[in-house]
Amino acid sequence: MAKADKATAVADIAEKFKESTATVVTEYRGLTVSNLAELRRSLGSSTTYTVAKNTLVKRAAAEAGIEGLDELFVGPTAIAFIEGEPVDAAKALKKFAKDNKALVVKGGYMDGRALSVSEVERIADLESREVLLSKFAGALKAKQSQAAALFVAPASQVARLAAALQEKKSAGDSAESAA
């Protein structure tokens, strides 16, 4: 690879690091081209799965201000650059690694810090943002209904008490007029 090509590759990878909300570093030893194509399809359009030379990736990470990943760039390494929601991509990688033992998740990077394998797996085990938001909205709606019931309850109790007093008074007046 010519020096100019390497510089371009480093700049491209550094740009991907900067644009990504998260990255997951994997080892793909033993995967076929068709396996890699299947993995890329399963990751969706918000994730770019890139195979690059470790030395170039290390330089690009340093250029992008990413620290703590150098020890992951050993052996055949590929990186999933995730733009947007990291949960779906982490789920897809975890499922693919479960089905294809040749794919090994080495770690990742998110929110300015390196992630261990277990942290990447925990992200994969989270529910998607949409599911969490809908659960939150449901909880808020339930609390609003409970609050509304609390506000309405005293007024209805007062109304029932007034009706009972009125009934009792009417019954008392009827008894006096009958006597």
From Swiss-Prot:
What gene name is listed for this protein? Answer: rplJ
Q: What GO CC annotations are associated with the protein?
A: large ribosomal subunit
What organism is this sequence from?
A: Mycolicibacterium gilvum (strain PYR-GCK) (Mycobacterium gilvum (strain PYR-GCK))
PROSITE patterns documented for this protein = RIBOSOMAL_L10 (PS01109)
- Lineage of the native species? Bacteria, Bacillati, Actinomycetota, Actinomycetes, Mycobacteriales
Keywords attached to this entry: Ribonucleoprotein, Ribosomal protein, RNA-binding, rRNA-binding
What exactly does this protein do?
A: Forms part of the ribosomal stalk, playing a central role in the interaction of the ribosome with GTP-bound translation factors.
Q: Does the keyword Ribosomal protein apply?
A: yes
Annotated protein name in UniProt = Large ribosomal subunit protein uL10
Q: Which family does it belong to?
A: Belongs to the universal ribosomal protein uL10 family.
Q: Which GO terms describe its biological process?
A: translation
One Pfam annotation, family name? Ribosomal_L10
Gene3D superfamilies for the chain? 3.30.70.1730
Kindly give the PANTHER family that the UniProt entry links to this protein: 39S RIBOSOMAL PROTEIN L10, MITOCHONDRIAL
Subunit (UniProt): Part of the ribosomal stalk of the 50S ribosomal subunit. The N-terminus interacts with L11 and the large rRNA to form the base of the stalk. The C-terminus forms an elongated spine to which L12 dimers bind in a sequential fashion forming a multimeric L10(L12)X complex.
- Domain of life of the organism in this record? Bacteria
